[in-house]
Design a protein with these regions (language model features):
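A short beta-strand motif characteristic of beta-propeller blades
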Residues: 117-121
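C-terminal partner/receptor-binding element of secreted or periplasmic proteins
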Residues: 150-187
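Short coil/turn segments at the loop-to-beta-strand junctions that recur within blades
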Residues: 123-127
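N-terminal export/targeting and maturation segments
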Residues: 55-115
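Blade-terminus and WD-like Trp-Asp/Gly-His loop motifs, strongest in beta-propeller folds
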Residues: 80-85, 130-138
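Internal/C-terminal transmembrane anchor helices
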Residues: 40-62
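Membrane-embedded alpha-helical segments of integral membrane proteins
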Residues: 1-32
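Membrane-interface helix-boundary motifs at transmembrane edges
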Residues: 31-42
Length: 187
């Protein structure tokens, strides 16, 4: 879905640039020869710009994790069950961009009682990923580089907190309703 929206946005920008160049040519003719003002071309260009802006707003403020392609994920380690057995946490790698791309890490928590699964952590993957339950509802996620920086730990209450390193989940109107607190990387 995200690829479709980004492709449509790119096509819209290219069309807007083409229409803008045509508009500039017609506007130059209007100035030089007093031809009719190119209203239709101006309206077409403005429509392309409006469509592009609408797609960008949709992409930014209506973000969901449904856009993750599960076919391109790989489980990092075995699932880790909470001390009371109410939740199970799993970490996955999401590969993107082919040879020149990268890897994101996703932590998904399943409520074993209601059999509901939700993503609570999404970030650029580093060298080591591990999950440790602190108590029945608190999960520590270590996404560490080779230097073992102590700031690479994120502790979340799995019931109502979420982390997205780029902040898209924090800006999303749809995800804000599901989570009480949202964290993002402030680097």
């Amino acid at each position: 879905m995200n690829l479709l929206i980004n492709g449509l946005a790119l096509l819209t920008v290219l069309l807007a640039m083409l229409f803008f160049l045509i508009f500039l040519g017609l506007f130059a003719l209007y100035i030089a020869n007093k031809k009719a003002f190119p209203k239709r071309m101006l309206i077409t260009f403005a429509s392309c710009v409006a469509l592009f802006l609408a797609l960008m707003v949709y992409n930014q403020y209506f973000f969901t994790f449904d856009r993750i392609d599960k076919a391109h994920t790989q489980q990092v380690a075995r699932p880790v069950e909470s001390p009371n057995g109410a939740f199970t946490a799993e970490a996955f790698y999401e590969f993107y961009g082919g040879v020149l791309g990268g890897v994101n890490v996703i932590v998904e928590v399943t409520d074993n009682k209601n059999v509901e699964t939700k993503i609570i952590y999404y970030a650029e993957a580093k060298a080591f990923v591990s999950l440790v339950w602190r108590d029945d509802e608190t999960l520590a996620i270590y996404n560490e580089d080779y230097n073992r920086n102590p700031n690479d730990e994120v502790v979340l209450n799995v019931s109502n907190e979420i982390y997205h390193d780029r902040g898209l989940a924090c800006q999303s109107v749809l995800l804000r309703k599901k989570f009480k607190t949202c964290y993002e990387d402030n680097k």
